Regions:
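Membrane-proximal helix-loop-helix interfaces that form the catalytic/acceptor-binding platform
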Residues: 10-13, 17, 21-348, 353-506
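Short, Lys/Arg-rich, polar N-terminal cytosolic tail immediately upstream
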Residues: 1-10
Length: 507
């Protein structure tokens, strides 16, 4: 009786703990959202596309080296029309996606992992850097995660079943619609479908395949339509291709690339830093061994989207890198959590129980504590990136008639352009520079001031110029000032996190 009572108490404690973690995760995301940090360059570039285009035009290749699924863009467009063109409207869908993802991850975790592993998985998912950060960024990666998790909740309970026509149409239509809202949806669908066939007995394989063909057909038609309407044209963007072109394996036998990509995954998109990514890899390996021995079918299902994505990467169709594969993070987190839980609970079954317990506690602390502490600080000190709004306000307040404004081209200039209209500036009031970013500070002087004057009529005959640098590494500020001092005299300076401006009297 006492044992049953203790087990019930532990079970209740774990349930309440998991609930508290979910509430904490939602609270942190809301704190970040309410802090209303300025859009940084990449967000601003996407925002300008959303604001300046019609719904039909959002089907065309985006300007400013941006790419996003049409469904995501349409929701963003709708929110700006309903709630106004501002940061809150633009980040509302990623926020909703982040909160829904927490709940969906909990549901998937209940199916996939043990009761001990579940709160570990939830706290990692809630607090790890990139699952948290992208929940409040104007990008599609938060909704990628949400859609991947929702599709798992939809399809996994239907594995190895002969479905009636209503359910076939349901999964077919929902999958077809999801493809338009998330580019990697096709890998989740293909992976789960393949995993289903692998786990189905040989006698049932043909029946299952024939039964699901209408749904698969709808998925393929939807993906083919979106591919030829949007993705194929995006792939013609040389800048985007160059940005990700080195992220593919050289050959199908490029195992070095595979090992490197596997290792990098734990740093980004999972978000384990420095030595902690190695510890996370260890926990993942332990968890994988546990799954393969105790729950091989679940392991195949969890890893099936990963293998489908890798197949596309080896075909040079989708980069296996960074934020583009954030949607795979939940599956790895579940395995990591089970690895930690295995060590924590093995003391009941091993003569070396103390060592397993110590190892489990150590791994749990090393992997959870840094992310938990970092996430907790956001309650009081929300994360900022490139706070250009106060910089523009300062310029507006201190600007004199005839002053010029110079800002580097690319994302930083898009950031300034997004906010310029809100402060009464038109495009004729500032010049976009010829440098996308000041990566090499020496270029600033070697190109010479003449190029700055010749690039735009707005800069000609300007005696005072405000040089605005959002997104420039703080360490490079002295180099910028050094070169500016050679072409003028500094009159003023103002800085905010991730952005600063110099006012110079030109020689």
């Amino acid at each position: 009786v006492n044992n049953l009572s203790n087990k019930q108490n532990i079970s209740d404690f774990l349930k309440y703990l998991t609930l508290l973690i979910i509430i904490f995760g939602i609270f942190i995301r809301l704190s970040q959202y309410v802090s209303n940090r300025a859009l940084w360059g990449d967000e601003a570039s996407l925002a300008l596309n959303i604001v300046d285009r019609s719904y039909a035009e959002l089907l065309q290749p985006l300007d400013r080296n941006q790419a996003a699924p049409p469904g995501f863009l349409w929701i963003e467009k709708l929110f700006t029309q309903l709630f106004g063109n501002n940061e809150y409207s633009l980040r509302l869908f990623p926020l909703i996606s982040g909160i829904v993802s927490l709940i969906a991850f909990y549901k998937l975790g209940k199916w996939a992992v043990s009761a001990i592993a579940l709160p570990i998985a939830i706290i990692l998912f809630a607090c790890l850097r990139y699952t948290l950060y992208y929940a409040t960024e104007l990008k599609q990666y938060s909704s990628d995660v949400m859609i991947a998790l929702l599709l798992c909740l939809l399809l996994i309970p239907l594995q190895q079943q002969i479905l009636n026509i209503r359910r076939i149409l349901l999964i077919g239509i929902l999958g077809a619609v999801a493809i338009w809202f998330s580019h990697p949806t096709i890998f989740v669908l293909a992976g789960l479908a393949s995993g289903n066939l692998i786990l189905t007995s040989n006698q049932q394989k043909k029946a299952i395949l024939i039964n699901r063909l209408p749904a698969y057909f709808l998925w393929l038609i939807s993906f083919g339509s979106m591919y030829f309407l949007t993705i194929a044209r995006v792939m013609q963007n040389n800048s985007l291709q160059n940005a990700w072109g080195d992220e593919y394996p050289n050959t199908i036998f490029d195992l070095l690339w595979l090992l490197d990509s596997f290792g990098r995954f734990f740093s980004r998109p999972l978000g384990f830093s420095t030595i902690f990514d190695g510890i996370a890899i260890l926990a993942f390996v332990i968890g994988s061994v546990f799954f393969i021995k105790k729950k091989p079918n679940k392991f195949i299902i969890l890893m099936s989207p990963v293998f489908a994505t890798l197949a596309a990467t080896y075909l040079h169709k989708y980069p296996f890198r960074g934020r583009l594969i954030l949607f795979l993070a939940p599956f790895f987190i579940l395995v990591i959590a089970e690895g930690i839980a295995f060590l924590l609970t093995s003391f009941n079954h091993s003569k070396h129980h103390k060592y397993f317990l110590i190892a489990g506690i150590t791994l749990a602390c090393l992997l959870i504590a840094p992310s938990l502490i970092r996430a907790g600080t956001f309650v009081f000190y929300p994360e900022n990136k490139h706070e250009i709004r106060p910089v523009i306000e300062y310029i507006k307040t201190h600007q004199k008639p005839g002053d010029g404004i110079y800002i580097g081209d690319g994302g930083p200039a898009d950031q300034f352009e997004y906010y310029a209209g809100k402060y009464g500036y038109s495009q004729s009031d500032y010049a976009r520079g010829y440098l996308s970013e000041l990566v090499d500070a020496e270029k600033f002087y070697e190109q010479g001031w003449q190029q700055f004057k010749n690039q735009s009529n707005q800069l000609k005959n300007k005696q005072r110029i405000w040089f605005v640098f959002p997104g420039l590494n703080k360490k490079k500020e002295p180099f910028v000032k050094l070169h500016l001092d050679r072409i003028g005299k500094k009159l003023d300076y103002f800085s905010q996190p991730g952005a600063f401006t110099y006012l110079y009297q030109m020689k």
